[in-house]
């Protein structure tokens, strides 16, 4: 079920104007619905079949491959994501970044669907507004047999909200 993305095929897909930057035929995960989003051209859904899990707190999540080793994830902050100052709660942004490591990491070419977060370091630089899409730009820095390393930034309408680095540890195939 969890096959590596073919780099050459992914690059060809990224260069295809008809695929809107998505790696066609990519194995994602059977529990994730991944299809073009009709309301957001060029973006693909990243919806979980089981809405009873923690990831449902983020709400609608979209993804877009931006080139080899790069992807962008988008969330739509709602009132339920706000803090007492009516801005996006830092915990909501951290949850979004964690999910972006997996979704964006997968579209960036990393085989990280069966992985756990090993490290996530985030620096908040500005506040995020409710009702305005929030993007996490993810870059795959390095991938080994057991680890994947990322860096990225969270932006809202071009303004830098946060930057982050993270590492995911892939599940062992021995057990």
Feature roles, as predicted:
Residues 10, 16-175:
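Terminal targeting signals and extreme-terminal segments of soluble enzymes
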């Amino acid at each position: 079920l969890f096959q590596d993305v073919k780099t050459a095929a992914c690059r060809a897909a990224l260069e295809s104007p008809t695929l809107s930057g998505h790696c066609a035929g990519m194995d994602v995960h059977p529990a994730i619905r991944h299809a073009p989003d009709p309301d957001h051209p060029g973006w693909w859904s990243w919806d979980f079949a089981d809405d009873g899990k923690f990831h449902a707190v983020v709400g609608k999540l979209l993804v877009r491959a931006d080139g080899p080793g790069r992807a962008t994830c988008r969330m739509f902050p709602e009132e339920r994501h706000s803090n007492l100052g009516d801005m996006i709660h830092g915990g909501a942004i951290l949850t979004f970044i964690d999910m972006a490591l997996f979704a964006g990491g997968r579209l960036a070419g990393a085989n990280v669907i069966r992985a756990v977060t090993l490290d996530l370091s985030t620096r908040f630089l500005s506040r995020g507004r409710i009702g305005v899409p929030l993007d996490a730009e993810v870059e795959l820095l390095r991938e080994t047999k057991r680890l994947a390393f990322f860096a990225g930034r969270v932006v809202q309408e071009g303004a830098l909200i946060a930057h982050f680095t993270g590492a995911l540890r892939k599940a062992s195939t021995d057990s």
